[in-house]
Curated annotation (Swiss-Prot):
Bridged cysteine pairs (disulfide): none
Keyword Cytoplasm: yes
Chain's gene name: adk
Principal location listed in the UniProt entry: cytoplasm
Claim: Nucleotide-binding is one of the keywords in the record: yes
Organism: Burkholderia thailandensis (strain ATCC 700388 / DSM 13276 / CCUG 48851 / CIP 106301 / E264)
Record family assignment: Belongs to the adenylate kinase family.
Subcellular location: Cytoplasm
InterPro entries assigned: Adenyl_kin_sub, Adenylat/UMP-CMP_kin, Adenylat_kinase_CS, Adenylate_kinase_lid-dom, P-loop_NTPase
Domain of life according to the entry: Bacteria
Protein name from the UniProt record: Adenylate kinase
Gene3D superfamilies given in the database record: P-loop containing nucleotide triphosphate hydrolases
Entry EC no(s): 2.7.4.3
Transmembrane segments: none
Length: 220
């Protein structure tokens, strides 16, 4: 099971990724984790990547793909792998294709932006314990107060509506075109000897268990 998980920030990809990893016994490939590990280990690619990071520059796609190919050779990838948050752009998707990285499924978790804004901007956090609430879906017993300590809850900057909207704008511009890219490739079929992944789209609305059932149905 070799899979790319697509969906906007706040669509619930992280939760479903955990279910997929457990069911199929595959690792989640995070480019951020890979970069940190390569830099820490001082591998040739890690040293090269660190030079970009130290200058505050984006690590080039060619380097990221090199790290991906190294990571996929490891034993835990024998049964497959799950990409979450990569590729983010058409250029990265093209680079993956050119590098011959095989993918069986591209799964999109679709949630309307209005729902994502409500989900994320309604979150409230108790800073000391990390306990989280939601003003609509999981409110505290007393508005604005932690259930256990009675201390005030905060809204993290990441959860503020204007921040959420900005992240969704970036997704719309950069990552959403991948949905068309993979949908078109699935229609065309094999290219450069690489089998096109099957493209599946499911609704990310409803209870977590309902969404999980949809995910597993889509991956049959």
């Amino acid at each position: 099971m070799r899979l790319i998980l697509l969906g906007a920030p706040g669509a619930g990809k992280g939760t479903q990724a955990n279910f997929i990893k457990e069911k199929f016994g595959i690792p989640q490939i995070s480019t951020g984790d890979m970069l940190r590990a390569a830099v820490k280990a001082g591998t040739p690619l890690g040293v090269e990547a660190k030079a970009y990071m130290d200058e505050g520059k984006l690590v080039p796609d060619s380097l990221i793909i090199g790290l991906v190919k190294e990571r996929l050779k490891e034993a835990d990838c024998a049964n497959g792998y799950l990409f979450d948050g990569f590729p983010r752009t058409i250029a990265q998707a093209d680079a993956m294709k050119e590098a011959g990285v095989a993918i069986d499924y591209v799964l999109e978790i679709d949630v309307p932006f209005s729902e994502i804004i409500e989900r994320m901007s309604g979150r409230r956090t108790h800073p000391a314990s990390g306990r989280t609430y939601h003003v609509k879906f999981n409110p505290p017993k007393v508005e604005g107060k932690d259930d256990v300590t009675g201390e005030p809850l905060i809204q993290r900057d990441d959860d503020k509506e204007e921040t959420v909207k900005k992240r969704l704008d970036v997704y719309e511009a950069q990552t959403k075109p991948l949905i068309t890219y993979y949908g078109d490739w699935a229609t065309r079929g094999e290219e450069n000897g690489l089998k096109a992944p099957a493209y599946r789209k499911i609704s990310g609305l409803g209870a977590v268990d309902e969404i999980r059932a949809r995910v597993f149905d889509a991956l049959k």
